Amino acid sequence: MKRNFERNDDDKPERKRPALASVIVEALKVDSLQKLCSSLEPILRRVVSEEVERALAKLVPTRLTTSSVFSPKRIGGPDGRNLQLHFKSRLSLPLFTGGRVEGEQGATIHVVLIDANTGRPVTVGPEASLKLEVVVLGGDFNNEDDEDWTQEEFESHVVKEREGKRPLLTGDLFVVLKEGVGTLGEIVFTDNSSWIRSRKFRLGLRVPSGYCDGIRIREAKTEAFSVKDHRGELYKKHYPPALNDEVWRLEKIGKDGAFHKRLTAAGIVTVEGFLRQLVRDSTKLRAILGSGMSNKMWDLLVEHAKTCVLSGKLYIYYTEDSRSVGVVFNNIYELSGLITEDQYLSADSLSESQKVYVDGLVKKAYENWNQVVEYEGESLLNLNQPERLDISQTDPVTALASYSTVPLSQFPEFAIEGYNQTLTTALPHNPQAQFDFVPQQDQFIGIQQPQTQTNIENENVTRLVLGPPQSSTGGYQDIKSSADQENLNPFEDWTNLSENDFFSEEEIRQTSHDLLANEDMQQLLFSMGGGKGEDGFTFPSFMQNTPMMQGYDEEGRGRSGKAVVGWLKVKAAMRWGFFIRRKAAERRAQIVELHDNNDGK
């Protein structure tokens, strides 16, 4: 029996053992399923919770009193208004976790309550002082920019924090309206937006439950935006970029990307280096980046780079060892101006002939950049700038101190065609007299014929005065007696003169035209350069000794001093024309007003 029993056991087939690979696969499946369940659980819990809350919200009104059942929320206000909340500020993007939510350029974010029927803010009533709640919406809410949505649609897109995470939005989450306008406080995102379907958020504003029962106020929403992890802020672009920023801080240049590597290989590692190469040879810079950068990308890159704030560092390239003439560059090697014999001319003020000359110097400087030196002298603003020489300025003594001892014998007269008399500035003919020109502020300088020159002596100062204006018969009015000359007052009230004492507008125009068309005047203006000052007059370049200024170095004065003297005479002639024109216009206005008053009586 025993043997038979053992035989029966031996006859049973042995159980097949599983292979090691199949065991591992089964274990991985179980582990994956457990992980999937653990990840789905918080999502399912949240969805179920939201659905339960929504179902309860629908059931609550049926349990209230009959008065509440038959008074549903209206779309507008009690007087038919269509009330809507609106954000009036755009957000500063990109946003990072832990960073404060701000408006563009750090501005405050404002919200306003408006009546959509009129488009005007609601400033009165209980709605104008509501308390609002800030919430987070999914970026896919109202993608069609439909202006009409229901409260249920808005609430269904409110985003809550992830399971086990901090509240998605922290800070001051309530806004109180004052006369229909409110300001968002300090709010911060604690989580990024990469975990939701749209991968973007929106900020929303709503009226909390319990406020304005029976009145529907449409909620506000911002544009969709991404919230990145704060660790990504290390790779953030700078607006505007700084000169010492690494070049990948610029738009379209990714850190350790292809463009970044090409620029680094070419020795361009900072924004300053990028701008310098852009100024000196933009074609070469474009070639360094290669064909992978499109024209649109290039334009955006250059536009962003040019927003960089420059420092005050200057460089200068001298044309000769004497260092009397040189071109000035800023710290990105862009032309700033020209220095010639202690005179500084900005690049914008150069005449066409000067620009041709300066362009040659700039090219030579770029070719011999090792000879360019950093400017370590005084500020260029402290150098004599001819465009700033204004004889009507408050302190003319300082501006013209170096020209106060030029002998009057050196002043040439201007022969103006079309006139019977020779014009000259109202200066004494005494060759021993010194040019001590100190006009008062707002005092106008005129032109007189030699026979009518008038001097006003006050504290040993010789002043230039404006002779009486021309009558309508044409020509310059003569002074009848020396007594009249002595009684002339440059500060007298010209409005007391009769209408016939002033030029007509046509005569003034013809006078100015003849004055500027004169050959000597044109020669002087051409030789003195073509820049323009603040008042529209040209000013000298002081780059060369013009024919009109030759022969005036007997007293050892520099060429620039003689040019300024000639310029003052030209400016006096110009001011004379403008002064007469203005006074004539004022006089005509007074006459018209007087006639209107007489007609009214």
Swiss-Prot record:
Chain span(s) of sequence motif Nuclear localization signal: 1-8
Record's keyword terms, sorted: Activator, Calmodulin-binding, DNA-binding, Nucleus, Transcription, Transcription regulation
Source domain of life: Eukaryota
GO cellular component, one term: nucleus
Primary location recorded for the protein, binned into one broad class: nucleus
Coiled-coil ranges from the UniProt annotation: none
MF annotations from Gene Ontology: calmodulin binding; DNA binding
Tissue distribution: Expressed in leaves, stems, flowers and root.
Region (DNA-binding): 144-267
Region (Calmodulin-binding): 1-74
InterPro entries registered for this protein in UniProt: Calmod_bind_C, Calmod_bind_M, Calmodulin_bind_N, CBP60
Disulphide bonds in the chain: none
Subcellular location: Nucleus
Family, as annotated: Belongs to the plant ACBP60 protein family.
Subunit structure: Interacts with calmodulin (CaM).
Function of the protein: Transcription activator that binds DNA in a sequence-specific manner, likely 5'-GAAATTTTGG-3', to promote the expression of target genes.
Name this protein carries in UniProt: Calmodulin-binding protein 60 D
Protein's organism: Arabidopsis thaliana
